[in-house]
Swiss-Prot record:
Domain remark from Swiss-Prot or TrEMBL: The [NKR]KIAxRE motif seems to be a cyclin-binding region.
Active site: D126
Stretch list, region Disordered: 311-338, 363-384
N-terminal signal peptide: none
Species lineage: Eukaryota, Metazoa, Chordata, Craniata, Vertebrata
GO cellular component: cytoplasm; nucleus
Coiled coil feature spans: none
Name of the gene: CDKL2
Binding of ATP, residues: V10, G11, E12, G13, S14, Y15, G16, M17, V18, K33
Gene3D superfamilies hit by this protein: Phosphorylase Kinase, domain 1, Transferase(Phosphotransferase) domain 1
Chief localization: cytoplasm
Start-end of Basic and acidic residues biased regions: 320-336
Record motif [NKR]KIAxRE, residues: 45-51
Protein name per its UniProtKB record: Cyclin-dependent kinase-like 2
Similarity comment text for this entry: Belongs to the protein kinase superfamily. CMGC Ser/Thr protein kinase family. CDC2/CDKX subfamily.
Amino acid sequence: MEKYENLGLVGEGSYGMVMKCRNKDTGRIVAIKKFLESDDDKMVKKIAMREIKLLKQLRHENLVNLLEVCKKKKRWYLVFEFVDHTILDDLELFPNGLDYQVVQKYLFQIINGIGFCHSHNIIHRDIKPENILVSKSGVVKLCDFGFARTLAAPGEVYTDYVATRWYRAPELLVGDVKYGKAVDVWAIGCLVTEMFMGEPLFPGDSDIDQLYHIMMCLGNLIPRHQELFYKNPVFAGVRLPEIKEREPLERRYPKLSEVVIDLAKKCLHIDPDKRPFCAELLHHDFFQMDGFAERFSQELQLKVQKDARNVSLSKKSQNRKKEKEKDDSLGEERKTLVVQDTNADPKIKDCKLFKIKGSKIDGEKAEKGSRASNASCLHDSRTSHNKIVPSTSLKDCSNVSVDHTRNPSVAIPPLTHNLSAVAPGINSGMGTATIPIQGHRVDEKTKKCSIPFVKPNRHSPSGIYNINVTTLVSGPPLSDDSGADLPQMEHQH
């Protein structure tokens, strides 16, 4: 990991931290996830192994790609491509919502990336604005830092469960262990209205409050989920809220078009078995109207190629810079400087630089000789022919025999250049990154969800859902201990 220069801290959590770094050889900016000492903590080791195995098989234009995996002193380091902008940043810049075409392009790529994960029997389970990166070219990258959260001011406390509650499907809230890919589709539905309107759809303050928000909009839970709710010891003594009058999406957001409302409703079906697959969503009228899907697919490929070229140009620029520095260094070393060494022979100390008046012919000869020589001499700018006297008493400070009668210039040892850059190591101290929060997010989200894992030993009742990426039960286990504490999952989609 010595080849990476640490540029600052991006986020941290109970299992490690994420750092912004620069590859010293190529100049490429990357994000490095640094786990805690995994060999001493079985939970950290399990999470690290699961994420490494999953990400190694995921290569897609709409997923942040894993570039390298390293282990040093019992710690695992995951090197990712770095993208420093998220959809959450957009929502904070535009609190009243994003433009229609922007949302269309974002959603198309989000669904495309999630669909790729689902095709590999992987569910993300933590789809939310801050986990969706956007490159400078507009390419969306789903990321899953899991334990990493944006740093905030000291004293603000939140749990990992609170941070993602707003986008959790009802089956997760009631404790259903037979959930599947439909939980990601639910999160997509939450994003649809949030990106258009600039406010979270279901901003619950607790699990029961979250269910209340959902039921107020979509109606009662399905019988199976109601039964699971009353059997769940977490909700002992608590009853589901009674909804006298619903506020459906079309009434809550009358300015949204019918096609947008229809897309959101399909994703937010209260019954997970009736939510569509990602492939079906991409064929929805929201994407097919006016030939958007076909047109944007071609545009997206150009954006991806542009990002790839930018990375390549960055590497070439860094290499050219290094070559130039090397050439400049060699050029400096090749220069012969006329410097009087105070520790040299006493006769040398008495050497003086004289301007000799000569004939015009002598001047022309001296000028020609000056052009032919690569040596650089100290001279009066008003004359082109200088002479050092006495030439026979000069000595070379580098102990190399030189015939000074032929070359009266003083030779000195080449200067020693220290070109090594002093850069902090990967474990050096890191600065903090602060992100300005505006609008309703200050009160509802930031105050509760800003400082990550201040109490890492305190687990939420539904803590079993806090791992961000897992696989469905159809495939072989990723590792012997990778799913010991996770709920079993079935294929629902």
